Amino acid sequence: MVSFDPQLGVLRVSGDEDASTVSYRRRPLSTALRATRDVVVDLSGLRFADSTLMLDLAVLAQRLRKRGRTLRLRGARPQVRFLIEQMGLDRQPAVMLEVLA
């Protein structure tokens, strides 16, 4: 499940996100594109993700960058963080992966 709070600039991603949930992500991702601040992606509730979510977040980051904004990835569990790193999302310009110690 993906939702966006425009007042806080937080995109919350929870549960399982894969190719079968792509259509449900479109509206919150589109809303996040219009953010007037940097966007924080709260991944703390995400149990499973595949490459489709990472690609959607990469596109969001590219579009936000064109508007002078950044995408901050926060609260990723180890397996999700591994996928972020494998897909290279954390190396994209304007993407910051916040890792808890």
Each model region followed by its residue ranges:
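STAS-like cytosolic regulatory interaction modules
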Residues: 1-52, 58-101
